[in-house]
């Protein structure tokens, strides 16, 4: 298998989920008491994508899945800090359940 035996380092993690936005909030949401109000557990409420875009226009043009992916990627890169590896050796893995 090509690449077998190579090491991988996970340096950042970004999460946008109904139980929390960001790594810490997500973890606390998983460990928390659950929903207090009757509602949809799969819904992200009070979402504001504007902090993740250069302009409000760009934020409006992006669909929800793109907004969440952008926010998660920015969080992961912030956690990773400065990466000294060659850019061609840096990668991102993105997963979604519905988007």
Model regions and ranges:
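Conserved "HGTGT" condensation-loop signature of ketosynthase/thiolase-family condensing enzymes
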Residues: 1-99
């Amino acid at each position: 298998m090509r690449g077998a035996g190579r090491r991988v380092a996970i340096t950042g993690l970004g999460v946008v989920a109904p139980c929390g936005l960001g790594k810490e909030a997500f973890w606390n949401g998983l460990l928390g008491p659950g929903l207090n109000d009757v509602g949809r557990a799969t819904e992200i409420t009070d979402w504001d994508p504007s902090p993740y875009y250069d302009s409000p226009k760009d934020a409006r043009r992006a669909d929800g899945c793109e907004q969440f992916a952008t926010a998660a990627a920015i969080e992961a890169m912030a956690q990773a800090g400065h990466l000294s590896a060659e850019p061609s050796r840096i990668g991102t893995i993105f997963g979604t359940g519905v988007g």
